Amino acid sequence: MITGFFGVPGCGKTTLATFFAQRELKRIKLFQSKFKRVYTNFSCSGCYRFDFRQLGVLDFSDALVIIDEITIDADNRAFKSFKQESVDFFIYHRHYNCDVLYFTQQWDAVDKKIRNLTQALYRIKKSYLFPFVTAKAIFRTCDINEYTSELVVGYRFPNFWEVFLALFHNKKVGKLRYCVFAPRLWKFFDSYSRPFTWAKWSPQIWS
């Protein structure tokens, strides 16, 4: 299953990604997980490190793959640089007992092929009750334009009946909301890590 999460900078995306990683690591240790490893492309205690370019090339079987800031490697405008090997990984991930969670600041900036394969989507927001991070499910709709007869994709939040069924853990509805206590996760990752090293320079002051 491929699940997408999006939210503005500083809303808690990496915190929530760490929550899923640490939760799965605990399940693996207790032999309660279908996975054997957890891979992340950001520094996260106990997880295996990987590079996006390795997807579809190296074996990621029986694993939970968590990708932070996916648009760095799979931007919708840079579709020509999106390799076929990576496409194959997302298409056949279930064949290898692999689930993918990805996080981004802009949902519509993610490569279209990945968006089309995304089965669940969540919007991340900072809770008014700091320091909690919340994520709310968003459902995609598909209608036919009566004038052009073309498919029109839209989005909506869960309706009353879906919220009601979720109370009984209905599998078809799925999880509608996540709420995590951020401080207990901060020790597992560095929110201010710098993935790039830029050249130093001396800016000039306007006269």
Model regions and ranges:
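Loop/turn-to-beta-strand initiation segments
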Residues: 35, 61-64, 96-102
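Conserved P-loop NTPase motor module
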Residues: 120, 135-207
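Walker B catalytic acidic pair
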Residues: 68-70
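Conserved lysine of the Walker
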Residues: 13-14
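Hydrophobic anchor at the beta1->P-loop junction of P-loop NTPases
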Residues: 5
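P-loop (Walker A) phosphate-binding loop of NTP-binding proteins
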Residues: 8
